[in-house]
Amino acid sequence: MGMRMMFTVFLLVVLATTVVSFTSDRTSDGRNAAFNAFDLIALTARQNCCNVPGCWAKYKHLCGRKR
């Protein structure tokens, strides 16, 4: 294997380990700070999207209200 291939495999292993670790941590602890921060960011983005007519037209199902 070449150096580039080994580096790619290394990155894939690190990514897979991180995903498994994050999801198992989230299921074991409902108060995960990173997950709660992500929820807050998603909520803020959704609220801002609902105020923009073009974004609202594309994602009406996320806004939950009629315009």
From Swiss-Prot:
Modified residues (Pyrrolidone carboxylic acid): 47
Lacks the Ser-Xaa-Pro motif that is crucial for potent interaction with nAChR: annotated span: 51-53
GO molecular function ontology, one term from the record: acetylcholine receptor inhibitor activity
InterPro entries: Conotoxin_a-typ (IPR009958)
GO annotations of cellular component type: extracellular region; host cell postsynaptic membrane
PTM sites of type Cysteine amide: 63
Removed propeptide positions: 22-46
Alphabetical UniProt keywords: Acetylcholine receptor inhibiting toxin, Amidation, Disulfide bond, Ion channel impairing toxin, Neurotoxin, Postsynaptic neurotoxin, Pyrrolidone carboxylic acid, Secreted, Signal, Toxin
Signal sequence interval, chain numbering: 1-21
Subcellular location: Secreted
Positions of disulphide bridges: 49-55, 50-63
Tissue: Expressed by the venom duct.
Stated role: Alpha-conotoxins act on postsynaptic membranes, they bind to the nicotinic acetylcholine receptors (nAChR) and thus inhibit them. Has possibly a distinct nAChR binding mode from other alpha-conotoxins, due to a different three residue motif (lacks the Ser-Xaa-Pro motif).
Family the entry assigns: Belongs to the conotoxin A superfamily.
Entry note about domains: The cysteine framework is I (CC-C-C). Alpha4/7 pattern.
Name of the protein: Alpha-conotoxin-like Pu1.1
